[in-house]
Every structure is written in C-alpha cells, then in structure tokens.
C-alpha cells in the first residue's frame, strides 16, 4: 500500500504583492518565489504531516521556484526523505511554454531520462493525460509514502480524475487554496485507489 499526498505549493509572492514582484524581480513571470509567510506555512504543513504519522521516502516537486521552496520546507521535517525534481509535474501551459529560473529555455518533458509525447504549449486534454501519466508512474515506482508538490490546476485535474472513478464521492475541485492536500492510499496488488482513503484538506 502506497500512501500519497499531493500538495499545492505555498503562498506565492506575485499574487500577494504584485508591485514588489514587478519592481524586484520581473524576469521569469511564471516563476514567482514564495512570500515569507509562504515559507512559514509550508514548514507547518510538513510538521502536520509528521504528526499524523506520515513519513515520505520521496518528496517529488515541480521545477518552479515556489514548488521547490515548498518541498524544501516540508523536507526540513523529514531529513531522511529524498527530494526529486520531476519535470512533468509542471504547471498547465496552454498558451506558451514557461521559462523559469531552473530552465530558462523551457521545462523538459522527459521522464526517467526518456523523452515523452508531451510538449508545450498543451491542450487541456493533453494536460490531463500528462497529470494522470506522471502520478501513475510515481506511484508505480514506490512502495512507501510519497509527497508530490505541484500546482493548483494539476491538483484540480487529479481530483476530477478520482471523482470520475468514484462518482459517489463528494469532491470539490473548484478551489484549491495554498497547500491544499489531496490524500489517498493506493493498493498496488489490486491496482486501485482505495475509495475510503480519499481526503482533501483545504487548510493551510
């Protein structure tokens, strides 16, 4: 059984203080860092995970500054966890490929050293395929607890995916505040998400 936590990144600077972002940064528009408060509540989220008995072997993160910073703060609570940058956890890119600090020419679309069929910009349907592909692969590659730090749009897509599997569940994907956490257990023997384990925590 693999326990999975998919977490939206913490509070981003450009939405909270756009003028400061414009004056002091203003280069990679898609790659805002966190606010000071964002760092604090990300670490708090890590402590809450630990207090619940969760102990991830791997913490996977999208390659954006805000997701990597969130993952790094969570990792301070789990010093034995391994932090892994996973390209395909990237934000939805419908109009143009995002240029970010780590990849100023655009984010790669490889998985496990191999090129995939995905590219940017992308349609909504290809984005859904990408989300389902990468989360499936990360679960396949693990037998212990994992954390996935990513973006609100990706979280919404995967919540809708679970809703399509279990229509009787009442899952709300319309709004995903900072650090929204989707939790579930995956039974690898039966190759399925355990319905009773699905939970969304909107608190931060």
From Swiss-Prot:
Site (Transition state stabilizer): 151
Family: Belongs to the phosphoglycerate mutase family.
Domain of life: Viruses
Record's protein name: Uncharacterized phosphoglycerate mutase family protein R708
InterPro entries per the UniProt record, alphabetical: His_Pase_superF_clade-1 (IPR013078), His_PPase_superfam (IPR029033), Phosphatase_SH3-domain (IPR051710)
CDD domains: HP_PGM_like
Active site residues of this protein: 9 (tele-phosphohistidine intermediate), 86 (proton donor/acceptor)
Gene3D superfamilies: Phosphoglycerate mutase-like (3.40.50.1240)
